[in-house]
Amino acid sequence: MESCITVIGERDVVLGFRLLGIQHTIIAEGKDLLKKFLEVFQNPQCNIIIVSENVKNMMDKRTLRSVEISSKPLVVFIPLPGVREEETIEEMAKRILGIDIGNV
């Protein structure tokens, strides 16, 4: 069974990742963004989902919590241009892996 990395988001974001060689990409905006994200999130072959941070605002609290604690697939939100990232790499590692890399 092949595992995959999938990128979901606005056209500019997705095209950038295609240039980096990621084959599984989905261009989606608006309501379609959440729909496509949930389809990929439920796919057992997908290991990593890189998605536009816009999708966070569309999720209900239960779905967002499920996504935040998921390690397979691991979901990485792409910050919106001009918006400061909320979660640092150290915080993400602690949340997902349960380890504190800030004091290493």
Curated annotation (Swiss-Prot):
Q: Where in the cell is it found?
A: Cell membrane
| InterPro entries for the chain | ATPase_V1-cplx_f_g_su, ATPase_V1-cplx_fsu_bac/arc, ATPase_V1_fsu_sf
User: Do the record's keywords include NADP?
Assistant: no
Recall the GO molecular function terms of this protein's record.
ATP binding; proton-transporting ATP synthase activity, rotational mechanism; proton-transporting ATPase activity, rotational mechanism
Keyword set for this entry? Answer: ATP synthesis, Cell membrane, Hydrogen ion transport, Ion transport, Membrane, Transport
Note the topology in the membrane: Peripheral membrane protein
Q: Which cysteine pairs make disulfide bonds? A: none
- Gene3D superfamilies documented for this protein: ATPase, V1 complex, subunit F
Q: Show the GO cellular component annotation of the record.
A: plasma membrane
**GO biological process: what's one of them?**
proton motive force-driven plasma membrane ATP synthesis
Q: So what family is this one in?
A: Belongs to the V-ATPase F subunit family.
The record ties this protein, via NCBIfam families, to: PRK01189.1
Subunit-level organization: Has multiple subunits with at least A(3), B(3), C, D, E, F, H, I and proteolipid K(x).
Q: What's this protein's function?
A: Component of the A-type ATP synthase that produces ATP from ADP in the presence of a proton gradient across the membrane.
- What this protein is called in its record is A-type ATP synthase subunit F
Q: Which organism is it from?
A: Thermoplasma acidophilum (strain ATCC 25905 / DSM 1728 / JCM 9062 / NBRC 15155 / AMRC-C165)
